[in-house]
């Protein structure tokens, strides 16, 4: 079954096509630091972009952070993700790992990543290697540092905006420290917008990726990451990035003036105003230990891309992930809400329900879908990658699967009820109307996830990274109250609903 694009995807694709049509065979202009107008353009059009050269960052971090990157790479902890783009599975050219607050997740391109926890107070994490534990500690230390720097940058931005000053962009230099005095409420707001709860680590060796796409609008060269807005972030929250390109990249690009445009041997980050063909884009070279910050609404109003250099590169991208529906505590609470409708459950797994109120049943089936498709299948689709670093998620996922299995029995109890003789026709119709949509969604998504686990892309993955279609069971499995394939169940429900309405 061909997937139908969402309205947002269709609009985005239409904008892209219109932009390419307007360009025809010409490139949009973009600026590099060697261009005379570069800093003026930055000041006028990109004032919420802050850059810090490596020399202004503590030397201790420059020693520890690269060691942490290399440690995780050595232990094979970074993975290319199989993401979903316009209904197709695509293997990312960049390898990633998510580190952050215990129980947090971060979703991008329809893929939910689960944190390898960093060692925060009050949480015991058992790592598979002492070196991995030390690396996670380092990224927590980097996170704390970047959080302080971000708050200071936001304070300075607030002062400049309040004074309506046309300040020189905060780049290639220390942040100003004086003359800043926000109110208590403002200070709380600034801290919340810099309260980084995860970092998404990235790695790519461009020499092993000969098929990288060309940047389509400006002619900037090979892209490691295409134009995008970072997803799933708290509104107006900042993003901080620490960049580390491996040895060799600096020596090869001493004289950038010999190039027209950006030096293709040096990694760059590119920025543009979304869907704007008038304002020149910016490309900023990224050398070892450089950092940049996207403040306030910059991530919403502008797009950015990462332009590949010639050497391998790591980055640590610190974010305030929007976790209102993305933490372990959240999904456990949702499960408990659904299970409140269980009256009795027997030793054989059968259950009876307290209420057959249509709204209660609908809510229960929607939670059933949420835990299955947003958590269990997302987790197991990524194979056994998380066990390489820690067993932290093993017990919670086993527990979630047990709760999900009880919800299967709850669905079975509802199906028994709609077949019960003597059930008033109107009540039967209301129950069927409440559960038919979530069960149809469940059937369609199970079919989709099962197909994804056998797609051409995943067949190329190493054994440890291959997706596990879980939960999955055969038709006659005595431990399961309902079949995996709900085609017949959904068809029967539709027939019953038509009969009840006739």
UniProtKB/Swiss-Prot annotation:
Q: What is its EC number?
A: 1.14.11.-, 1.14.11.53
Q: How is the cofactor bound?
A: Binds 1 Fe(2+) ion per subunit.
User: Which amino acid positions bind Fe cation, per UniProt?
Assistant: 228, 230, 304
**Classification via InterPro entries:** AlkB-like_sf, FTO, FTO_C, FTO_C_sf, FTO_cat_dom
Annotated region described as Fe2OG dioxygenase domain, given as residue ranges: 32-324
Please list the residues that bind substrate: 96, 108, 228-231
Enumerate the residue ranges of region (Loop L1): 210-221
Q: Null mutant: what phenotype?
A: Elevated perinatal mortality. Mice have normal body weight at birth, but show growth retardation from day 2 onwards, resulting in a weight reduction of 30-40% after 6 weeks, both in males and females. In addition, animals display reduced nose to anus length. Fat mass is reduced by 60% in males and by 23% in females. Lean body mass is reduced by 26% in males and 19% in females. White adipose tissue decreases more and more over time, while brown adipose tissue is not affected. Serum leptin levels are decreased, while serum levels of adiponectin are increased.
UniProt cross-references to Pfam families, sorted A to Z = FTO_CTD, FTO_NTD
Annotated Gene Ontology cellular components are: cytoplasm; cytosol; nuclear speck; nucleus
Query: Where the protein is mainly located, per its record?
Result: nucleus
Needed co-factor(s)? Fe(2+)
> Kindly, how does the activity depend on pH for this protein?
Optimum pH is 5.5-6.
Reaction catalysed by this enzyme: a 5'-end (N(7)-methyl 5'-triphosphoguanosine)-(N(6),2'-O-dimethyladenosine) in mRNA + 2-oxoglutarate + O2 = a 5'-end (N(7)-methyl 5'-triphosphoguanosine)-(2'-O-methyladenosine) in mRNA + formaldehyde + succinate + CO2; an N(6)-methyladenosine in mRNA + 2-oxoglutarate + O2 = an adenosine in mRNA + formaldehyde + succinate + CO2; N(6)-methyladenosine in U6 snRNA + 2-oxoglutarate + O2 = adenosine in U6 snRNA + formaldehyde + succinate + CO2; a 5'-end (N(7)-methyl 5'-triphosphoguanosine)-(N(6),2'-O-dimethyladenosine) in U6 snRNA + 2-oxoglutarate + O2 = a 5'-end (N(7)-methyl 5'-triphosphoguanosine)-(2'-O-methyladenosine) in U6 snRNA + formaldehyde + succinate + CO2
Question: Which GO MF terms does the UniProt record name?
Answer: 2-oxoglutarate-dependent dioxygenase activity; broad specificity oxidative DNA demethylase activity; ferrous iron binding; mRNA N6-methyladenosine dioxygenase activity; oxidative RNA demethylase activity; tRNA demethylase activity
Q: Which residues bind 2-oxoglutarate?
A: 202, 292, 313-315, 317, 319
Q: Which SMART domains match?
A: FTO_NTD
Q: Which residues carry this modification: N6-acetyllysine?
A: 213
Q: How is its activity regulated?
A: Activated by ascorbate. Inhibited by N-oxalylglycine, fumarate and succinate.
Q: Where in the cell is it found?
A: Nucleus; Nucleus speckle; Cytoplasm
Q: What does the annotation say about its assembly with partners?
A: Monomer. May also exist as homodimer.
Q: What's this protein's function? A: RNA demethylase that mediates oxidative demethylation of different RNA species, such as mRNAs, tRNAs and snRNAs, and acts as a regulator of fat mass, adipogenesis and energy homeostasis. Specifically demethylates N(6)-methyladenosine (m6A) RNA, the most prevalent internal modification of messenger RNA (mRNA) in higher eukaryotes. M6A demethylation by FTO affects mRNA expression and stability. Also able to demethylate m6A in U6 small nuclear RNA (snRNA).
Q: What is known of its domains?
A: The 3D-structure of the Fe2OG dioxygenase domain is similar to that of the Fe2OG dioxygenase domain found in the bacterial DNA repair dioxygenase alkB and its mammalian orthologs, but sequence similarity is very low. As a consequence, the domain is not detected by protein signature databases.
Protein name per the record: Alpha-ketoglutarate-dependent dioxygenase FTO
Q: Which organism is it from?
A: Mus musculus (Mouse)
């Amino acid at each position: 079954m061909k997937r139908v694009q969402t309205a947002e995807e269709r609009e985005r694709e239409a904008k892209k096509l219109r932009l390419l049509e307007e360009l025809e065979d010409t490139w949009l202009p973009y600026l590099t630091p060697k261009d005379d107008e570069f800093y003026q353009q930055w000041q006028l059009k990109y004032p919420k972009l802050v850059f810090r050269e490596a020399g202004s960052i503590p030397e201790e971090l420059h020693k520890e952070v690269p060691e942490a990157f290399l440690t995780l790479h050595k232990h094979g902890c970074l993975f290319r993700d199989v993401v979903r783009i316009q209904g197709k599975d695509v293997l990312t050219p960049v390898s990633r790992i998510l580190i952050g607050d215990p129980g947090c997740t971060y979703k991008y391109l329809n893929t939910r990543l689960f944190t390898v926890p960093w060692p925060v107070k009050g949480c015991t994490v058992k790592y598979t290697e002492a070196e991995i534990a030390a690396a996670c500690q380092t990224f927590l230390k980097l996170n704390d540092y970047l959080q302080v720097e971000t708050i200071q940058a936001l304070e300075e931005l607030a002062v400049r905006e309040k004074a309506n000053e046309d300040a020189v962009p905060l780049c290639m230099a220390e942040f100003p420290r004086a003359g800043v005095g926000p109110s208590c409420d403002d200070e709380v707001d600034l801290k919340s917008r810099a309260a980084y709860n995860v970092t998404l680590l990235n790695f790519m060796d461009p020499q092993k990726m000969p098929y990288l796409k060309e940047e389509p609008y400006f002619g900037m060269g090979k892209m490691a990451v295409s134009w995008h807005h970072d997803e799933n972030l708290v509104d107006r929250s900042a993003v901080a990035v620490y960049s580390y390109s491996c040895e060799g990249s600096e020596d090869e690009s001493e004289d950038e003036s010999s190039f027209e445009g950006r030096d293709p041997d040096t990694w760059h980050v590119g920025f543009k105003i979304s869907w704007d063909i008038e304002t020149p884009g910016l490309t900023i070279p990224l050398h070892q230990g450089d950092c940049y910050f996207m403040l306030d609404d910059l991530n919403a109003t502008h797009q950015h891309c990462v332009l590949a250099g010639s050497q391998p590169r790591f980055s640590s991208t610190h974010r305030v992930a929007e976790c209102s529906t993305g933490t372990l505590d959240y999904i456990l609470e949702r499960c408990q809400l659904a299970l409140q409708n269980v009256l009795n459950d027997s030793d054989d797994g059968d259950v009876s329900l307290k209420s057959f109120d249509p709204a209660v049943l609908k809510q229960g089936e929607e939670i059933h879908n949420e835990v299955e498709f947003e958590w269990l299948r997302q987790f197991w689709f990524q194979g056994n990658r998380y066990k390489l670093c820690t067993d932290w998620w093993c017990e919670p996922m086993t527990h979630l699967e047990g709760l999900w299995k009880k919800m299967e029995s709850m669905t079975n109890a509802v199906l028994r009820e709609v077949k019960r003789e003597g059930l008033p026709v109107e009540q039967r119709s209301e129950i069927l109307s409440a559960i038919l949509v979530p069960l149809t969604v469940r059937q369609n998504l199970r079919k989709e996830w099962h197909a994804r686990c056998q797609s051409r892309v995943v067949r190329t993955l190493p054994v440890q990274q291959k997706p596990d279609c879980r939960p999955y069971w055969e038709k006659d499995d005595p431990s399961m109250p309902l079949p995996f394939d709900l085609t017949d169940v959904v068809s029967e429900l539709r027939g019953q609903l038509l009969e009840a309405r006739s």
